[in-house]
Amino acid sequence: MRSPPGAVAALASVAAQLATAALVPRDAAAPTTAAMPLPFPAQVGIDDSNLATCANANWPPPSSPVGEVISAQLPDADLQAALGEVDPARIRAIVDKLVGFGTRHTLSTQTDPTRGIGAARDWIAEEMRGYAATAGGRMEVTVPGYVQGVASRISFPVKISNVVATLKGDKDPDRVYVVSGHYDSRVTDVMNYEADAPGANDDASGVALAMELARIFATRRPAATIVFTAVAGEEQGLYGSAFMAQTYRNASVNVEGVLNNDIIGSSTGSRGEKDPHTVRVFCQGGSPAGESKERAETRASIGGENDSPARELGRFIAEVGGNAFTDMKVALVYRLDRYLRGGDHRSFLDAGYGSAVRFTEPNEDFNHQHQDVRNATDGTVLGDLAEFVDYDYVARVAKVNLAAAWSLANAPPQVRNVTVDTSTLSNDSGLSWAKIAGAGAALVKGYEVVWRPTTASLWTHQLYVGDVASFRVPLTKDNVIFGVRSVGLNGYKSPATMPFPG
């Protein structure tokens, strides 16, 4: 294209001035008169008649050429029946009983039959044994523990015991899922083991949830094993859960998911805000513990930091747990936990069990956590008292947990060794995976490919590909995150697994 005549003249003028300026020595005196501004060249004309406008841009693509928009995994008749058995009155009775032990501080008495953590432990175990009696020998209740020596927040040697109810899977018993809460409590001074520490919300609510699910599941036969546990030592430093997680790790137990429930008892926050139909699920991202340096670097290079095992579990919980049958919305929070706080799911993550998440109420009221029971000068009642627990809300959170545990335990195992072909440049994406083997193979109907835009939080599309070990999708891997999940003969689906280059 020829430049307009005006532009040529202007450019020539600029060039002449620059040439003159170049002849002036660097140390020459500044001119005594103000320099004239250089004239700008005339604008070059552009024919934009064939260019699309922003309004016509097509990103992200409005639809996929293959597959279908993903849909929630709604409960079947059996799961609906189980959800209908969750009882707020039973949950309330458990919380009231635990509060009635006065304190459940880890360092409190273990010999008094009516007060302290020992009495609480014995009562929880006895209740769990009652549930086990209805399970036809498939549920075993144990109270494993160890003596913790003097350590952080432990001023003298003390026995730390967990109550563990294990419901053996009917078809794939070596695959294990854990539902947990902690039964110890505290007040303002974390070392004060004498004062009343009701711990109604933190965390009798979580223990009540785990116990209620143990009761409901005891009469049923999930395909995989589910463990319902009340752990101790959380407030002093996650001692009980660390002992449990390491015990499982040492025995090479295949824990495929941990649902930790801690502070799930209130729908009202410190400013009076109410959100009775939402529960937060905290899911850590990045590389899970034990991932090799090379694999972690690959994860970072492909944008896989948002597809950790914990976040895949979180997406699964949102898909199966947020619906009209639970009357809840699952709000995923992409971090390990809240600021300045911690929970027992971390013990499992640290032990190398990457699929561990935490359930917590949406709005917390710190007047009713870690507080001495008292009245403030303005009349505010302080303390973690049972009167501040919303039992209907706890029951709904229990339904989300029940839907998740049921769906996990009755689906086939999660797919392993998923790869995407990067051997050549292509706008198609070749995916491969290892077909489910062992006891879980009998549960499998086939496999499903899922995907989402790289900026999306949840899976957006799905494509059932059959009982195969590879599939080529007519989508570019550069623009989406893929996942592969197993589909059961009963319709239940596993959490997805993101592919690595292979």
UniProtKB/Swiss-Prot annotation:
A Gene Ontology molecular function term of the record: metalloexopeptidase activity
UniProt superkingdom: Eukaryota
Chief location of this protein within or outside the cell: secreted
One BP annotation, GO: proteolysis
SUPFAM superfamilies assigned to the protein according to its UniProt record, in alphabetical order: Zn-dependent exopeptidases (SSF53187)
Domain Fibronectin type-III: 414-502
Disulfide bond annotation, renumbered to this chain: none
Residues linked to a glycan: N250, N375, N417, N427
PROSITE patterns per UniProt: FN3
Cofactor annotation remark: Binds 2 Zn(2+) ions per subunit.
Keywords from the named record: Glycoprotein, Hydrolase, Metal-binding, Metalloprotease, Protease, Secreted, Signal, Zinc
Location within or outside the cell: Secreted
Gene Ontology cellular component terms for the protein in this record: extracellular region
UniProt cross-references to PANTHER family, sorted A to Z: METALLOPEPTIDASE M28 FAMILY MEMBER (PTHR12147), PEPTIDASE M28 DOMAIN-CONTAINING PROTEIN (PTHR12147:SF26)
Descriptive protein name: Probable zinc metalloprotease MGG_02107
